[in-house]
Amino acid sequence: MSAANMPTTTGAQGSGNQVPTTSTTIVNHFRELIKEPKNLDEAANYLFQTLLDDAVVGIFNETHHLRKSGNLAALDGVPEDSTYRMCEMPNLDIFGISTAKKPMDCTCPNCDRLVAAARFAPHLEKCMGMGRISSRIASRRLATKEGATSAHLHSSGNTGGTDDEDDVDWSSDKRRKKSNQNSRNNGSKKNNGKTF
């Protein structure tokens, strides 16, 4: 069915009944009314009434369809009043979020001690033995343990030794010597200690 032949309902002039018509019928009836100059008021009223009826019936049908399909509530959306309400409860801010201080302590998974949140990462590093200082202590412990083991093996008369014991300890030769305080420039190369 084309748009020109779509059935619409119109109210007959002077009577209260609704007559289903098509748009071509409406246009033909309007042209007949315009032919005579004395019927122009009737033609204007007829055209207005037809357009109004068509718009009202269209809105009614669409609303009825949305209500029956359950989509009418989705068309309305969420009411805006609830988003701008202020909360006036004690210990809550205007958005309803608690203002009470939260405990800032963490429990260490390794030793089950309560540690302040700001100190948790350094504590966990030391507690698990993974920090920089812990690795240095572990290296020293291994070096002293190896030294005691090799001294024990040499004193017992075993001269065979393993390949690990024969290797040169590379880390002991590269230990950094402390610099003398007088030889430092404190970061400035200016004047080199000379006065002019």
Curated annotation (Swiss-Prot):
Q: Which domain of life is it from?
A: Eukaryota
GO CC list: cytoplasm; DUBm complex; nuclear pore; nucleoplasm; SAGA complex
One of the GO biological process terms: positive regulation of DNA-templated transcription
Molecular function (GO) terms for this protein are:
transcription coactivator activity; zinc ion binding
Subcellular localization is given as: Nucleus, Nucleoplasm; Cytoplasm
Residue spans with biased composition (Low complexity)?
A: 180-196
Q: Which InterPro entries match?
A: SAGA_su_Sgf11, SGF11
Phosphoserine is found on S172
Note the zinc finger regions (SGF11-type) by start and end residue: 106-127
Question: What's one Pfam family here?
Answer: Sgf11
- The record's region (Disordered) falls at 1-22, 141-196
Keywords recorded for this protein, A-Z: Activator, Chromatin regulator, Cytoplasm, Metal-binding, mRNA transport, Nucleus, Phosphoprotein, Protein transport, Transcription, Transcription regulation, Translocation, Transport, Zinc, Zinc-finger
Protein function: Component of the transcription regulatory histone acetylation (HAT) complex SAGA, a multiprotein complex that activates transcription by remodeling chromatin and mediating histone acetylation and deubiquitination. Within the SAGA complex, participates in a subcomplex that specifically deubiquitinates histone H2B. The SAGA complex is recruited to specific gene promoters by activators, where it is required for transcription. Required for nuclear receptor-mediated transactivation. Binds independently on SAGA to promoters in an RNA-dependent manner.
Q: Which family does it belong to?
A: Belongs to the SGF11 family.
Record's subunit section: Component of some SAGA transcription coactivator-HAT complexes, at least composed of Ada2b, not/nonstop, Pcaf/Gcn5, Sgf11 and Spt3. Within the SAGA complex, Sgf11, e(y)2, and not/nonstop form an additional subcomplex of SAGA called the DUB module (deubiquitination module). Interacts directly with not/nonstop. Interacts with the AMEX complex component xmas-2. Interacts with Cbp80; important for promoter recruitment of Sgf11 that is not associated with the DUB module.
Share the domain note from the entry: The long N-terminal helix forms part of the 'assembly lobe' of the SAGA deubiquitination module. The C-terminal SGF11-type zinc-finger domain together with the C-terminal catalytic domain of not/nonstop forms the 'catalytic lobe' of the SAGA deubiquitination module.
What protein does this entry describe? SAGA-associated factor 11 homolog
Q: What's the source species' lineage?
A: Eukaryota, Metazoa, Ecdysozoa, Arthropoda, Hexapoda
